[in-house]
Amino acid sequence: MRWTPSVLFNQIKYCCGNQEIEDIDIDRQSKANTFDCFPLMFIKNNDIPKKEIPGLANFEGNCYLNSILQCFYYCKDLTNFFIKKENEIIKKGGKLSNAYLDLILRLNKKEKYNDAKILLNTLKEVSYNFFKKGGNDPKAALFYLLENLHNELKEQNLDYNEEDICCEDIDQEKAFQKYKKNEENNKSIISELFNWCLLTKNECKKCKNFHYICESQNNILISLNKYETENKNVILDDLIKFYFKDDEKHFICNSDKEIFKVKFTKKIISLPQYLIIILNRNIIQFNIIYEDCIDLSEYCVNENNVKYKFIGASLTNDYENKEGTHAISRCMTPEGSCIFSDLITMKNCKDINEYNPYILFYEKMQ
C-alpha cells in the first residue's frame, strides 16, 4: 500500500486543528499515470485549500523525488534567485539551470497539476545514477541536481587536485589555506545556501597515511546535532550516507546496536543558509528512539549554536512490518514541524528498500 492523497490530506486536517475541510476526491485508477505528489509546504490556517493542493504530477513513479523538488521550491532564497535571474538564466544558463527554472515557474503558478517532466528528463539524460536498473534512485538525482546546478552557476571552475596536498609531509595549515582559496573561486548560489566543504581525515592513496584533505563539493550537507538514544549519545551525522559519483567511492557508517562508529573526522568550515540531512534508512534497525527524531523535526542547533527551523521532508513511500505494509505521510504542521505519522512503529520493520532514505530540510533562523 502506498500513501494516497486522502491519507495526506487527513494529516493536514489533523495538524491544522481538525478544521472542516472538504476532502479531495481523486479516482486513482483513472489517474494512474498522473498520481498527484502534493507539496511539502507551510500550511497556514487562513489559506488551507478547500478542495485540492497544487503539486507536481507524478512522473514515472517518482513521487519521492517530486517531494524533494518541492522542498527545494520552499527554500525561498534559491527560488527567488532563479525568479530574479530568469532572463539571464534563459540566455546564459546551462541545460539543467533552465530546466530547474522551468519547474520553479510552473510551481509559482499555483496550479493543480505541474509537470516536472523537463527537469526529470534532463536528469535522466545526464545522471547515470538517476534511473537504475530495477528502479529509480532519487537520492542520486538530488546529489546530481545540487552539484550540477552549482557547476553551471558558479563564477569559475574549481582548480583543485587532491594529489597537490595529499602527501607524506602534509601541512594541515597549508591544506586549510588552499581550501579557503578554492572556496573563494568556487562560489555560486548553491554553495552559498547549501554547500559547506569539510576537512576530512582520509587515507592517502599514495602514502597510505591518514591526512586532512579538502573534500569535494559533491558531498551533501551534514549536521552535527546530537540526541539521546538508549543510554547513548549519538552524533546525527554518523547516520548520514555519503554519496560520490564513483560508485566505488562511497561511505556508509558501520554501526550496530551497541556502538556507532564513524569513519571520517569532520570539521565545519562555514555555515550554510540551509541544511539537508540525509538519514540512512538502515538506522531503524538500531533501536533509535523515534520520539527524539520528532523533537528534532521542529528545529536543530549545530555545534556553533546556530538554530535551524524545519521547512520540509521527503520520506519513503512505504515499509513492511509484522502487521503488513504501511505508508508514511508527508506533510507539515502550520508551525513548520513535520508529522512522522508511522515512524515510531518502524522498529518492527522486516524489509527495507535501500533506495529511499529520509531527507530533512532546515532553514537557518534569523
Task: Annotate each PLM feature.
Residues 195-196:
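Low-complexity, polar/charged sequence tracts that form flexible coils or short amphipathic helices
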Residues 2-5, 12-168, 276-277, 361-365:
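USP/UBP deubiquitinase core
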Residues 163-183:
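Intrinsically disordered, low-complexity regulatory segments in eukaryotic proteins
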Residues 188-192:
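Short, recurring structural edge motifs at helix starts
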Residues 103, 202, 207-210:
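Structured, charged N-terminal subsegments at the starts of enzyme catalytic cores
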Residues 62, 201-203, 328:
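Beta-sheet entry/capping signal
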Residues 2-51, 72, 82-90, 184, ...:
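Exposed substrate/partner-binding surface patches
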Residues 199-201, 250:
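Residues immediately within or flanking Cys/His clusters that coordinate Zn2+
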